[in-house]
């Protein structure tokens, strides 16, 4: 009996991996219980950092790898505290390996014993070590256990004289100004349009995306726009789509600081396809996300797409 030939499956080329648009940065927040770590983490979150609370020490190197490799995460902050237990003893050694993976800063928070006692009294929450000992003894024990970590910290903040708002302002001043203030000086608009209805008059930069496969010729996609998940997935499935988004994003991140230095306060980037329904819409959305991740103030406008 003759052997039946089997058809070989067609293997599609993998889409190129998105490049990092900004240098990676990891901030590790640690310190005494009641010193304000939750408030500081919230401040980093408001600055656009990807935030994680109470990650096990043994997972920190893996998280550092993620921050270093992921195009979606440029800046991250995580909290490590006494809840980790004996794992904290390994933190100084872990930090040495993490610093070889990604730029890292350790922020150590502390406060006077009297202030910590008052905060625990006001919140009526037990100290993490206070199940079998008084709060004051727990604070003293925690201070001793965290002493080796305090020695390797890049920044120490005594929160005794700070309220929540002042502590937030301090974090914004130390970590937010250099990274976000200049970015906020310019408003970026990503506009999608159709060439059928003409080119936007206010476009500073214009890109023709009609070289991408057109979903209009796929009957099931015709009623929808590039914002529909299935349509967007279809357009992204082509290697040239990801290559274009990667290259355009890199170009824009290079150009924007130069526009800012010349005093430009807004920039309109237009992406055009035939009807302004599918390809240009999807590209404008994806580029907007990339620029927002890089810290810029970005809005998206779909001129010719149904609202």
Curated annotation (Swiss-Prot):
Lineage top rank: taxon: Bacteria
Keywords: ATP-binding, GTP-binding, Nucleotide-binding
GO MF, any single term: GTP binding
PANTHER family assigned to the protein according to its UniProt record, in alphabetical order: RNASE ADAPTER PROTEIN RAPZ (PTHR30448:SF0)
Binding site for ATP: 31-38
Residues that hold GTP according to the record: 81-84
InterPro entries associated with the record: P-loop_NTPase, RapZ-like, RapZ-like_N, RapZ_C
Name the record gives this protein: Nucleotide-binding protein Acid345_3782
KW Cell inner membrane (keyword) present: no
Recorded family membership: Belongs to the RapZ-like family.
Native organism taxonomy: Bacteria, Pseudomonadati, Acidobacteriota, Terriglobia, Terriglobales
Keyword Isomerase: no
Purpose: Displays ATPase and GTPase activities.
């Amino acid at each position: 009996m003759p052997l039946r030939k089997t058809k070989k499956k067609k293997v599609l080329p993998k889409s190129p991996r998105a490049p990092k648009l900004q240098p990676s940065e990891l901030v590790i927040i640690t310190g005494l219980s009641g010193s304000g770590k939750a408030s500081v983490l919230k401040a980093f979150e408001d600055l656009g950092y990807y935030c994680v609370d109470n990650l096990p020490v043994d997972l920190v190197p893996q998280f550092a790898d993620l921050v270093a490799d992921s195009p979606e995460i440029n800046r991250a902050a995580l909290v490590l505290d006494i809840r980790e237990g004996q794992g904290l003893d390994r933190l100084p050694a872990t930090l040495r390996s993490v610093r070889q993976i990604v730029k890292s800063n350790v922020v150590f928070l502390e406060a006077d014993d009297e202030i910590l006692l008052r905060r625990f009294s006001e919140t009526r929450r037990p100290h993490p070590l206070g199940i079998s000992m008084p709060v004051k003894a727990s604070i003293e024990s925690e201070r001793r256990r965290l002493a080796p970590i305090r020695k390797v910290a890049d920044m120490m903040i005594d929160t005794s004289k700070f309220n929540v708002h002042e502590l937030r302002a301090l974090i914004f001043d130390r970590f937010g100004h250099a990274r976000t203030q200049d970015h906020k000086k310019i408003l970026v608009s990503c506009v999608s349009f159709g060439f059928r209805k003409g080119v936007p008059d206010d476009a500073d930069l214009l890109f023709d995306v009609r070289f991408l496969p057109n979903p209009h010729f796929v009957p099931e996609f015709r009623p929808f726009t590039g914002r529909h998940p299935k349509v967007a997935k279809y357009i992204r499935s082509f290697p040239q789509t990801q290559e274009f988004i990667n290259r355009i994003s890199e170009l824009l991140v290079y150009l924007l600081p130069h526009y800012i230095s010349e005093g430009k306060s807004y920039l309109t980037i237009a992406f055009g396809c035939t009807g302004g329904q599918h390809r240009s819409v999807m590209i404008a959305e994806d580029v907007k996300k990339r620029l927002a991740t890089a810290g810029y103030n970005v809005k998206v406008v779909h001129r010719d797409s149904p609202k």
